[in-house]
């Protein structure tokens, strides 16, 4: 909507309406929305120590928090420069090659390595938005805005999962996490952005 040039009052109005709808749905239909373990993942972020007794048993609590707990420890143990890609102390994180690849990067390459990885992704997002802003075709602008926004949201959610700020929902880190369908769709998105860029760049041969 922002890329289409709509007024902020319409965008904020739509956001407020969506927020109200979600609040009403949770207030009256919370018992029918989501499965038990999905709620546990949300509650594990809000109350990781289970002080409110949201988990029915200690075994369930430990199982729910285990992956994020190990990921947090792995990132923290990496320090500034990490423990080395093939050496040093490594903290095992379940399925680290998927959703928690950032925890492995943090453990191996440290804070600096994470900054480099996220910096590359940030540059890609900025370039995507810039390509859309320079596009003379509205469709091209919409494509770049949508892809840039989706990438930005995906990166933010994955980082939040790894830092234990958001619940685990299976969102990958673009271009770094394993996953055939995810990588395929990302390359398709990059191809679309490159197509928009090429159609708005003068040819060297006139």
Which residues are covered by each model-predicted region?
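Transmembrane alpha-helix boundary/anchor motif
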Residues: 23-24, 33, 37, 120-127, ...
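A juxtamembrane structural motif centered on a specific transmembrane helix
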Residues: 154-206
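Hydrophobic transmembrane alpha-helices and their immediate junctions
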Residues: 111-155
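Hydrophobic, glycine- and aromatic-enriched re-entrant/interface helices and adjoining loop segments
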Residues: 12-114, 138-140
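Transmembrane helix-bundle signature of multi-pass membrane transporters/permeases
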Residues: 16, 92-93, 104-107, 147-151, ...
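Structural signal for the C-terminal ends of transmembrane alpha-helices
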Residues: 1-8, 122-132, 193-201
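Alpha-helical membrane-inserting segments
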Residues: 3, 20-28, 153-156, 160
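Membrane-interfacial segments
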Residues: 7, 28, 32-33, 129-136, ...
């Amino acid at each position: 909507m922002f890329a289409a040039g709509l007024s902020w009052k319409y965008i904020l109005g739509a956001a407020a309406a969506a927020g109200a709808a979600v609040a009403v749905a949770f207030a009256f239909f919370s018992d029918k929305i989501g499965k038990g373990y999905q709620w546990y993942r949300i509650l594990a972020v809000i109350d990781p120590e289970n002080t409110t007794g949201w988990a029915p048993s200690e075994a369930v609590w430990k199982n729910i928090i285990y992956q994020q707990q190990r990921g947090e420890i792995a990132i923290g143990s990496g320090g500034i420069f990490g423990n080395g890609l093939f050496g040093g102390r490594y903290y095992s994180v379940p399925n680290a090659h998927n959703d928690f690849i950032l925890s492995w990067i943090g453990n191996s390459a440290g804070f600096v390595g994470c900054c480099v990885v996220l910096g590359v992704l940030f540059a890609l997002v900025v370039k995507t938005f810039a390509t859309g802003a320079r596009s003379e075709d509205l469709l091209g602008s919409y494509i770049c805005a949508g892809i840039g926004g989706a990438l930005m949201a995906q990166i933010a959610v994955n980082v939040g999962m790894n830092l234990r700020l958001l619940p685990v929902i299976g969102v990958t880190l673009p271009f770094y996490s394993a996953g055939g369908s995810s990588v395929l769709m990302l390359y398709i998105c990059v191809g679309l952005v490159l197509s928009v860029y090429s159609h708005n760049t003068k040819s060297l041969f006139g």
